[in-house]
Structures are given as structure tokens and as C-alpha cells.
């Protein structure tokens, strides 16, 4: 089971095409109501889709999945909150290869895919079948966030800029 959820920057149309190419995998999705209405006719039998649910339910739904999959439709930072939530819950992230995501997911901290359905399909299948590697990737990403994105690191960097 894989999870995709959130608001801004998600490429829902592309995600639906990935799900259609992987009928044997369940896709748990949480999308905004307008996107739900726009795409509901295209949901496959392997898609469990909810919209506009409370955050606690969102997190519980995410935790029922092995991997968080987030195709993006923008180069701008998007999906970061979902990635942080995934890391906090020990879930590996697979997302679009963008300038922003390259920085976060380098060195085995996640997987990046291009605009090719087969690439996404193969990557998702690989990590669903290799749980230890997915867990290791999730742990690396969690450590990276704790070390590089902490309030302490931010304060030190800001202080260095002010006095430097």
C-alpha cells in the first residue's frame, strides 16, 4: 500500500495514471475536495480516496501505508509537510525529481523519479519488495531533518549571517 496526500503541488492526474499502471497495489489518497470532484470518475478499484479529513485521520491513513508517493506538478517547494510527517512516522518518500527535492533526498534519503510512469512503477515496486531498504531510507531522511533542518541549526546559521 502506498499513500499520497496533501494540497498544493500534487500532480493528481499523473498519480492516477501510476495507480492505473499498478492495479495490484493499493493507493491511499487524501486530496482537496475540488480535486476529488475533478478526478473521481478516473479512480481505479485500487484507489481509496478521501478528501478534506482532519489531520489526525490524515496521519492514521498515511501510517496504514508502506511508502509515501508524491508526484509534483511544480519545481517550487511542495509536499514538504507530508515529507516531514512521513519521516516522523518511519515512511520512505518517493517524489518527483526537482531542484528542491534533489537537496532533500540525496544520498539514499528517498527516491526521485522523472515524468515516466514506468520509472515510478519500477521504483514503487522495488521499495515495496525491499522493506529493509525503504526503512533505511526513511531513517536516513529522518536523521537528515533532525540534523540539518532543526531550529538549532537554523538559529546558528542565522546568527552566523548576522555576526559574519
Show which residues each predicted segment covers.
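Conserved donor-binding/catalytic loop of nucleotide-activated donor transferases
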Residues: 63-65, 85-92, 96-97, 106-107
